[in-house]
């Protein structure tokens, strides 16, 4: 295999459209959002379609999985890792407090009681939304359901006297026209591998590493098929007919790359 045959990815299950519609409908009742992105591809895992429903709301963009990523600091993005839970929790709560400071002062000036700010945690599938909420909640957290004006489909969890969070299912982009972007989203575990050609993903990953991170490749090779043959031989991946199992080699290579076995990287290099 030397070329990519896929043209685009159009994978948008019906339940995701319902989530889109629901969030758009509830935007007036949500005070702010936390968008979780992948630090290996913060721009590619940013969901501008969902963000457009909350243009005038306070936003925290949090890039997780920094333990897998090579990244540059960005004033608009808070970077962190769930593998450093205490540090991450402290940074997130401090940032959220600052984010709503002005609103809190406005309410105090009017002699109003401090309201509970409702934050929707959004992001693409498998970026770490639920894991973040599990980190932020206390053992005796209060799960609030059926609040006035809030659909039963959204459960609100109290993480502080002033903050309520709602975890939303991962929502994917409606359409991806550039197949290479789709491959990168597979390699960050956002897109299920079943919807793409896994060999093409492996070939893309090999060529990407060869261009940008040659030192991370486990074996030197002139071509992708040569790489898979070396991989299968070294790992002892042999079929019954004593043939090299290059299909299994491809799957293992992708799994190990996703899990960071070869080192930190960014998927936003040209």
UniProtKB/Swiss-Prot annotation:
GO terms for biological process: ribosome biogenesis; translation. Residues 20-174 form the CP-type G domain. One of its GO terms (cellular component) is cytoplasm. Pfam families: MMR_HSR1. It is found in: Cytoplasm. It comes from the Bacteria. Its main location: cytoplasm. One of its GO terms (molecular function) is GTPase activity. GTP binds at residues 126-131, 170. Keywords: Cytoplasm, GTP-binding, Hydrolase, Nucleotide-binding, Ribosome biogenesis. InterPro entries: G_CP_dom (IPR030378), GTP-bd (IPR006073), GTP-bd_ortho_bundle_sf (IPR023179), GTP-bd_ribosome_bgen (IPR019991), GTPase_MTG1 (IPR016478), P-loop_NTPase (IPR027417). Required for a late step of 50S ribosomal subunit assembly. Has GTPase activity. Binds to the 23S rRNA. PANTHER family: MITOCHONDRIAL RIBOSOME-ASSOCIATED GTPASE 1 (PTHR45782:SF4). Belongs to the TRAFAC class YlqF/YawG GTPase family. MTG1 subfamily. This is Probable ribosome biogenesis GTPase A.
